[in-house]
């Protein structure tokens, strides 16, 4: 088990971050970076092989002298016997010992449920005590020790309403028309990237929201995005793209009220264009936004489509494309920050879904396939205009302000309300 302790003999209370996979690393990494800039000790627990691979190949993390890395792989193949046996090593008492050993003063995780205090039959409680995943065990242990728990955003949202997909409707139908998020009220802080996303969640859930905080987006801002893209590997387009405008199309999450057939037809039209080359990228959660084997073969048969998956990062692909085509992913914010043209074929999503693009601009929104193709093929494709308030409303302000806010708010929770601690090194340095 990897366990690198760079904290030396320091007795300072520490922030502990948990990263479960690629999405967690993407969204929590900027918070870790901001908080570690103070040179106070930070602990990062990795619970999957993918998280470990990403964290241990990030230079600024591996070179930091105040970041301790701990490997607790209980999220790989969760139903396998090997994983179940491994979880026995991370039972509740072991989780408490870990928090005590590293003098943890606060536990920071991505959004998610907060397990309630133990209830139910004794055998069920014993099973949870022994076999729960390490994230749940650490959350329970933090509650046992009276440590603050903070949930930071899982990405961001382009939507100003909650999408009422079939899955969401089923859950709400069993909970008096609301999403059952009341357990989120038990966090010391449940952080949102924007006020409009907070309002959408609170309006449709049982969460009261007294602990709901808007700190801005650590992942999407004008400080972190350029830093992230500067570290991305170079993606080389195929020879078939030479002399053509490269249109990068992110496959949407189909359950977000997206017209799948019309989306595939638009992809095929782009691939048939004489001046465009289609590059398709699936979402990080492939089961939500993948292509079937038949769809894959049909697009490949055009001879003018490149389908990318696996290790190639979204940052590398966006850097290498000429225009981004996307329906509702927050990855479009990267294009806006990088001043790259972004086209949103809004006709592909149900009209009930309203977005920040409708309110503040930033996207070329089209209402038909022909209008989309016409725009993509236009001789001069520029960045869509946006309201002057866009960065403040969507990202929470300038990047150095946002990351400094995360740093100060989290350390203040560690130090307690009576602390006069102030940052000696800001996140903007």
Predicted segments, located by residue:
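Conserved catalytic-core segment of nucleotide-activated headgroup transferases in glycan assembly
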Residues: 27, 33-36, 218-296
